[in-house]
A protein has these predicted regions:
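PLP-dependent amino-acid enzyme catalytic core
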Residues: 1-336
Length: 336
């Protein structure tokens, strides 16, 4: 492992946990029920890796594999689709539990709600999920992608019937463009997994959608004889996935919390810098492997209690969503 792990233990004082209800068990049950109403729904697998656990020196390792999700090879569709359902529910004065797939795609709802245009910015998976959901629910989608995005990712989104383009902008500027266009378009809605002041409701709904994955995991762990993982490793991303995972499992295991380890690449280390400052390069598996096999991380292991009794949960959030780039990285060792 060429890059060093930079780490900080979050020692911020506990608050009143005012945001935990967002990922409350009953709220996430609604998201799970909604996703189960799709004819394409099936649980993604949770795989136990006993040989890897033995190699790393921990008791158990489990990996949730999202490469099977809705045929899109990534978990992101869970968030965008549920956010759309919550938006339609709000606009029609209904509870989202009243809007399963069969109702959302009905002629009656089309007459009642009509059609909205959902705008988003994406590097690939989130936008594809929004486009897929809009297509299935009879809505419109407009997707902006930043410079450097591959044609494969653009084509995957275009196949779902969305209006999609690659802008000569970075990701953050694409988000601003999508938000501006949504504001200027009649019945335009921005569906983004990044929150900012004044835009927090839809990102919270997206997090709840991700909760479907977490709820599946809780049930699957129990079915495999694991009442509770001791450590949960999760990718930071823009924060929505990590927030969803930590929020859900903090509710599920409220009486005996696991240790949560949020991992992000050094090039986008916003959460690390925030934790190190006292404010609110490796993928999680690479970080776990380094922690358990390299002497220089002994203090880190001790700090978070990783040892031979640990039961570790990780998330593989996508498969080969861009097959050519995937082969270059995984098979050929290239960086793109």
């Amino acid at each position: 492992m060429d890059q060093k792990i930079l780490w900080a233990v979050n020692k911020m004082p506990k608050t009143d946990d005012k945001n935990l209800p967002i990922m409350g068990l009953e709220e996430i049950k609604k998201a799970r029920t909604f996703h189960k109403s799709f004819p394409q729904y099936s649980e993604t697998p949770l795989t136990k890796l006993p040989h890897m656990a033995s190699y790393l020196g921990v008791k158990e390792v489990y990996v949730k594999d999202e490469s099977y999700r809705f045929g899109l090879n990534a978990f992101k569709v869970l968030g965008g689709s549920f956010a759309m359902a919550r938006y339609i529910a709000k606009e029609t004065g209904k509870d989202v539990s009243e809007l399963p797939y069969s109702v959302l795609t009905s002629e009656q709802l089309r007459k009642e709600f009509g059609q909205a245009t959902f705008f988003t910015a994406t590097d690939g998976n989130h936008g594809r999920g929004v486009a897929w959901a809009a297509n299935r629910l009879g809505q419109k989608a407009v997707v902006h992608m930043p410079k450097g995005t591959t044609q494969t990712r653009l084509q995957n989104i275009a196949k779902e019937g969305a209006q999609v383009d690659i802008q000569e902008l970075n990701y953050d500027d694409c988000v601003r463009l999508a938000a501006k266009e949504a504001d200027e378009t009649p019945r335009g809605v921005i569906v983004q997994d990044t929150a900012w002041d004044g835009y927090e409701e839809i990102p919270a709904w997206i997090m709840q959608g991700y909760g479907t994955m977490a709820m599946e995991v809780g049930e699957q762990l129990k079915a495999q004889g694991c009442e509770r993982p001791t450590h949960i490793f999760v990718q930071a991303g823009v924060g929505s996935l990590a927030g969803a995972v930590v929020g859900y499992f903090s509710n599920l295991y409220a009486d005996n919390l696991p240790t949560f380890v949020v991992v992000e690449a050094e090039a986008a280390a916003c959460l690390y810098k925030g934790a190190a400052a006292g404010e609110s390069g490796a993928a999680p598996f690479g970080a776990l492997a380094a922690m358990m096999t390299m002497d220089e991380y002994k203090d880190l292991r001790n700090d978070i209690g990783l040892d031979e009794n640990s039961k570790v949960l990780l998330f593989s959030t996508e498969g080969d969503t861009d097959p050519d780039r995937y082969k270059n990285i995984v098979w050929k060792g290239l960086d793109k």
